[in-house]
Amino acid sequence: MTALSETEHKGAFYGRRVGKTLRQGQQQALARTLPRYLIDLPTVAEPAALFPCPVDEIRLEIGFGGGEHLLSEAKRFPRAGYIGIEPFLNGMAKAVLELDLAPQENVRLFNLDAALLLARLPEGSVSQVELLYPDPWPKRRHWKRRFVRPDNLDLLARALKPGGVFRFASDVPDYVDWTLREVRAHPAFRWTQTRADDWRTPYEGWPGTRYEAKAIAAGRVPTYLSFARV
């Protein structure tokens, strides 16, 4: 599969890029700290070289929100290089503010469409991809905007190494069912869970997220899916 160009994939990201006005501290952190962590497409041919510290593997989180899960995992696994992908500026600002206060050398950030990065990374260079509480696009006419769809699964399969892991968490039953159908139908992936407790139980070391806490408080039940690259 050839890499996508920015022109070819123009408009593939759906949703707002900016929400509420950023606080002064967030604006200052973006200006001061984001350039240190931000990567661009021409630099990803050698992913391990993106990090100033030695890393044994590369992991991605697509749509990291405020970054609490991304940064928690990076602390747990200091020998893994984490690339967080978030086009939404407000989420990026929250993560960068935390990095401004407590730098983490095994973290790098990407602020464009995840598909562009997945297409440029070397084949089989990623050990884990996480998609946690993505926008479910609940209206039927918007389902084509969901990230989990055949073209993006092709890109995930390309980037993941054999045995690599794709994780998906959501509190929207329809999107969970959709993801199970789409991923199980793709020849490059295998669903690794066999019991209900497997997908009802958070992943090992799961720190939770602010969004998840709100969902549970509202009575919604999260599901945690895991797939392996065959």
UniProtKB/Swiss-Prot annotation:
Organism (species): Azorhizobium caulinodans (strain ATCC 43989 / DSM 5975 / JCM 20966 / LMG 6465 / NBRC 14845 / NCIMB 13405 / ORS 571)
InterPro entries with a match to the protein in the record: SAM-dependent_MTases_sf, tRNA_(Gua-N-7)_MeTrfase_Trmb, tRNA_methyltr_TrmB_bact
GO molecular function, one term: tRNA (guanine(46)-N7)-methyltransferase activity
One Pfam family cited in the UniProt record for this chain: Methyltransf_4
Protein's name in the database: tRNA (guanine-N(7)-)-methyltransferase
Active site: D135
Catalytic activity entry: guanosine(46) in tRNA + S-adenosyl-L-methionine = N(7)-methylguanosine(46) in tRNA + S-adenosyl-L-homocysteine
Enzyme class: transferase
